[in-house]
């Protein structure tokens, strides 16, 4: 509803209250162009209405004929109404004090980090730092993360985060498979590894022919395994000296992975010092809310000789064009967008925002502060152990850092009942054992309450007192950590971890980093296939509510009623949007959703006695995650050609489907295609594959062009993943978090992922767990719930239509200057367009990279470079950008084309021109020695509008070759900046 100007309303008969109530105002906040601007854009395209444009763009054979069936959410809610409704759900959760542990802990998020990172759009709306010159702030924060991991684990090099600890362990397994014993397919897992980790490792192992054996750690050296996974400390709390075992494993030709608790490593000998080849773990307890399981940043660190086999992103140090230190993503040739099925992993989105929070936690506390926290946690555990012993309980693990396991016998249920009465959760180890893990939030009062619980269950009338226990411990020679495992090596010695301990200094450090970067809070980010749309503040607010942020993923079901109702509602919303029958929210990235979907397809074929079906057809234009995921799922990738228009070559598809009919498992297609068009024959593609026994996987990366207009489940798809961090407004966070739900047809619903170890069994024949928590990154799901609730069915459809309108407007305006490579009937595109810069390179020597860097001088993040076609830019404006911002981008692109024309016509030198030397830093522009053939003003202010609003790149063009040849992935000494 559009409100008229109050002055006009006052001159009329008073309206009713109902007429003045506005429920859909959020849609006007979310959708950038107003009605007048949309009409002007439509006129430029030659259409009278948005509906007419959509009729011309989307094939009639796949159009939805009914509104989105959103049920109670069909009508939009105002921001206040949606928040109130979600608050009602949140209030149905019960926030108990959870000592369940098992890899998840309560943590204090320093408020300076909460407000200035997690709640700051300068951080959470940024994209993955593939354009290093405009990403130096978050690259530095991620480099700090890598330095933190390297120091604490004692290994040579760390990546910049993975999805969760369980996934990191699975990645470590496949890493060791690539480099390990050629005659062994056995991966040995100690039986005191976290149960959810064992489950995810098993899920990953089966499709690629790895046999997982689980047993006592002591037997690992005799298992003839290419790799061994140890937990340090173990799930039940034991702190074991694995030095001799690691030597024996190495002597037998195996390698060692250690899943290590990061806080414990501040006081324990790091695994890199006693024989670990790889270390993995979770950084959640470094200031990140537990959030019902996620999102959290995992880590993976390796010995130096394994660095080129690492999965995930890696920040490295290089130099810029002026020879100054600069940061960039290093060794990108390992990644799926380049290596495809030969990549080290299918990981795309990781957990950058959470990694940044964890690194800043270490920066803020420093080594002394972290060690103090660790010693306090260990002391509280020791006090509790002593008190429980005095009450007659037997401690199973005599060594510990923060986790205790007790023999409780017949008192087990009484102990749980007494704890629940005090709103406390303990870990249910077995019918005769109880476990608990303390953390930095555990206070003296909490300890007293726990002692009361143990006393009550024991029938004791006298409760041990904390001060008395403390005196007993102080006078005792007994150590909870074996003296041989006490850490002696220094860590976090770099200056960044030792100078920002006051809030003033920390605040300014965070501001200095965010000022270096371009995020959505500054300008449009027109990245094709990435959907950088508005992440509204009202959507983000609930993320930090305690009722969502402070719930343990394995808390009893009766404490998570509101969470599960919200999740059920969101799943129903996504079912409505996709046209499928069921959705699982467990995958915590799009790559993981792809992987889960392919495992589901395999499970379906196996249930029909056709487990031999393992061929996956993938168009040549597919995103690199598709073949990488297919390879991980144990499938053979067969590439299907595309025709001159960028569509799937139907004749080649028929040929390949017929050729592989006996083994055809699936086809993976993206719709609209990665070429930015709605293929007219998508139904025929689906029918061909079905006729030859395969299933159709529709990649949902481009769902932002389909919501409300068409649905993969209705035009022939059997399974899709979605990217909630694209279509449904979860922010990209500078490279994560993400959520990649997998949506399936009715015949596949029985195969959705379970998680047996936590009791989450939703599907009778479900595949194994694909992430460590039952609902993946649960605490950010309210973002998508809020978006859908505030938009309603009609406005979600309007958003899709506007995204298509914006893309066609940009394509139309830029077509005279840059050829639009692919289009559908009438020269129209879907929600993105590909600009062909290859002819420009031939005529001027200017490359797509030059244009991307020059855009930084104009204050823009570059569109997607050289995907899916080398030498092109793929532009996706989304529905959230206003016409004014679109015109600003168009103006910049046209101005750059004129700069290129000057080179073509000989008015500018082919090497000494503003594109070849872009981006230009302030230091370069004001330097006394200016030797370029173009003016300083041309370098700095190529358009007059930039004078009032100028973004200055902090570094010049990064030297990629130097960075990979001189790989350095730790913090740079301060002297290098001086």
UniProtKB/Swiss-Prot annotation:
Keywords linked to the UniProt accession: Oxidoreductase, Pyridoxal phosphate
Reaction catalyzed: N(6)-[(R)-lipoyl]-L-lysyl-[glycine-cleavage complex H protein] + glycine + H(+) = N(6)-[(R)-S(8)-aminomethyldihydrolipoyl]-L-lysyl-[glycine-cleavage complex H protein] + CO2
Source taxon at top rank: Bacteria
Cofactor(s) annotated in UniProt: pyridoxal 5'-phosphate
SUPFAM superfamilies: PLP-dependent transferases (SSF53383)
UniProt keyword Oxidoreductase, yes or no: yes
Protein name per the record: Glycine dehydrogenase (decarboxylating)
PANTHER family in alphabetical order: GLYCINE DEHYDROGENASE (DECARBOXYLATING), MITOCHONDRIAL (PTHR11773:SF1), GLYCINE DEHYDROGENASE, DECARBOXYLATING (PTHR11773)
NCBIfam families associated with the record: gcvP, PRK04366.1
InterPro entries found in the cross-reference section: GcvP, GDC-P_C, GDC-P_N, GDC_P, PyrdxlP-dep_Trfase, PyrdxlP-dep_Trfase_major, PyrdxlP-dep_Trfase_small
GO-annotated molecular function: glycine binding; glycine dehydrogenase (decarboxylating) activity; pyridoxal phosphate binding
Subunit note: The glycine cleavage system is composed of four proteins: P, T, L and H.
Protein role: The glycine cleavage system catalyzes the degradation of glycine. The P protein binds the alpha-amino group of glycine through its pyridoxal phosphate cofactor; CO(2) is released and the remaining methylamine moiety is then transferred to the lipoamide cofactor of the H protein.
Keyword Transcription regulation: no
GO biological process: glycine decarboxylation via glycine cleavage system
One Pfam family cited in the UniProt record for this chain: GDC-P
Any one of the GO CC terms: glycine cleavage complex
């Amino acid at each position: 509803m559009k409100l008229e100007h109050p002055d006009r309303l006052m001159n009329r008969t008073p309206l009713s209250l109902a007429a003045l109530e506005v429920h859909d105002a959020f849609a006007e906040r979310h959708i950038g162009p107003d009605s007048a601007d949309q009409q002007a854009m439509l006129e430029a395209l030659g259409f009278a209405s948005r509906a007419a444009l959509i009729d011309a763009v989307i094939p009639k054979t796949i159009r939805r004929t009914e509104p989105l069936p959103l049920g109670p959410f069909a009508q939009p809610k105002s921001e206040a109404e949606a928040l109130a409704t979600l608050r009602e759900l949140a209030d149905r959760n019960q926030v108990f004090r959870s000592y369940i542990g098992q890899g998840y802990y309560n943590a204090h998020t320093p408020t300076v980090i909460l407000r200035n990172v997690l709640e700051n759009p300068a951080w959470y709306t940024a994209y993955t730092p593939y354009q290093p010159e405009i990403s130096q702030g978050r690259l530095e924060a991620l480099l700090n993360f890598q330095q933190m991991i390297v120091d604490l684990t004692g290994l040579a090099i760390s990546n910049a985060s993975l999805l969760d600890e369980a996934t990191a362990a699975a990645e470590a397994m496949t890493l060791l498979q690539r480099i390990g014993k050629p005659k062994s397919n056995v991966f040995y897992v100690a039986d005191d590894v976290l149960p959810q980790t064992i489950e995810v490792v098993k899920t990953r192992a089966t499709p690629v022919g790895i046999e997982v054996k689980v047993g006592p750690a002591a037997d690992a050296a005799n298992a003839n395994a290419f790799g061994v996974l140890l937990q340090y400390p173990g799930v039940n709390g034991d702190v074991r000296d694995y030095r001799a075992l690691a030597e024996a494993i190495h002597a037998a030709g195996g390698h060692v992975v250690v899943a290590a608790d990061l806080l414990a490593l501040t006081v324990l000998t790091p695994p890199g010092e006693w024989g670990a080849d790889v270390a993995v773990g979770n950084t959640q307890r470094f200031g990140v809310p537990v959030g019902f399981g996620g999102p959290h940043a995992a880590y993976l660190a390796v010995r130096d000789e394994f660095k080129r086999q690492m999965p995930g992103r890696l920040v490295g140090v290089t130099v810029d064009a002026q020879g100054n230190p600069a940061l960039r993503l290093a060794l990108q040739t390992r990644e799926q967008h380049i290596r495809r099925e030969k990549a080290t992993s299918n990981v795309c989105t990781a957990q950058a925002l959470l990694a940044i929070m964890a690194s800043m936690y270490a920066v803020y506390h420093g080594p002394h502060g972290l060690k103090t926290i660790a010693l306090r946690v260990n002391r509280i555990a020791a006090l509790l152990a002593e008190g429980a012993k005095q009450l007659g309980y037997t401690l199973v693990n005599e060594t510990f850092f923060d986790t205790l396991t007790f023999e409780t016998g017949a008192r087990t249920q009484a102990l749980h009942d007494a704890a629940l009465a005090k709103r406390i959760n303990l870990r249910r180890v077995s019918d005769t054992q109880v476990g608990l893990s303390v953390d930095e939030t555990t206070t003296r009062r909490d300890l007293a309450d726990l002692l009361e619980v143990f006393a009550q269950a024991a029938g004791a009338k006298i409760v041990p007192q904390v001060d008395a226990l403390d005196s007993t411990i102080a006078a005792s020679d007994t150590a909870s950590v074996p003296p041989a495992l006490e850490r002696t090596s220094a860590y976090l010695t770099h200056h960044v971890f030792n100078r920002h301990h006051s809030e003033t200094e920390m605040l300014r450090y965070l501001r200095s980093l965010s000022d270096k970067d371009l995020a959505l809070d500054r300008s449009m980010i027109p990245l094709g296939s990435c959907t950088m749309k508005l992440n509204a503040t009202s959507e983000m607010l609930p993320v930090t509510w305690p009722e969502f942020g402070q719930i343990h993923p394995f808390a009893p079901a009766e404490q998570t009623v509101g969470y599960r109702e919200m999740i059920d509602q969101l799943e129903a919303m996504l079912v409505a949007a996709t046209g499928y029958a069921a959705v699982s929210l467990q995958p915590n990235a799009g790559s993981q959703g792809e992987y889960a979907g392919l495992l589901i397809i395999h499970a379906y074929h196996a249930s029909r006695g056709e487990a031999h079906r393992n061929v996956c057809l993938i168009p040549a234009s597919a995103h690199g995650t598709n073949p990488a995921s297919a390879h991980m799922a144990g499938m053979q990738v067969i590439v299907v050609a595309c025709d001159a228009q960028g569509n799937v070559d139907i004749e080649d598809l028929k040929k390949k489907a017929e050729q592989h009919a006996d083994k055809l498992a699936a086809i993976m297609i993206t719709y609209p295609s990665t070429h930015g068009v709605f293929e007219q024959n998508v139904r025929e593609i689906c029918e061909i594959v079905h006729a030859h026994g395969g299933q159709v996987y529709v990649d949902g990366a481009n769902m932002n062009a389909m919501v409300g207009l068409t649905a993969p489940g209705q035009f022939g798809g059997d399974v899709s993943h979605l990217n909630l961090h694209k279509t449904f407004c979860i922010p990209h966070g500078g490279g994560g978090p993400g959520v990649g739900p997998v949506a399936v047809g009715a015949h596949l619903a029985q195969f959705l992922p379970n998680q047996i170890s936590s009791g989450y069994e939703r599907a009778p024949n479900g595949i194994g767990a694909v992430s460590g928590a039952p609902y993946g990154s649960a605490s950010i799901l309210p973002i998508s719930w809020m978006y859908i609730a505030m938009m309603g069915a009609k406005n979600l459809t309007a958003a899709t239509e506007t995204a298509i309108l914006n893309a066609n407007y940009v394509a139309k305006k830029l077509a005279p200057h840059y050829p639009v490579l692919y289009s559908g009937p009438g020269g129209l595109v879907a929600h993105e367009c590909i600009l062909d810069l290859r002819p420009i390179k031939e005529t001027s020597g200017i490359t797509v990279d030059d244009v991307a860097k020059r855009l930084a001088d104009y204050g823009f993040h570059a569109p997607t470079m050289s995907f899916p076609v080398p030498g092109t830019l793929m532009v996706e404006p989304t529905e959230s950008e206003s016409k004014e911002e679109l015109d600003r981008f168009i103006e910049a692109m046209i101005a750059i084309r004129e700069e290129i024309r000057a080179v073509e016509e000989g008015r500018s030198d082919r090497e000494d021109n503003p594109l070849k030397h872009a981006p230009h830093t302030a230091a370069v522009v004001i330097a006394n020695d200016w030797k370029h053939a173009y003016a300083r003003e041309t370098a700095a202010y190529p358009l007059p509008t930039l004078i009032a609003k100028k973004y200055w790149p902090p570094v010049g063009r990064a030297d990629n070759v130097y960075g990979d040849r001189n790989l350095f992935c730790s913090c740079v000494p301060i002297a290098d900046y001086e």
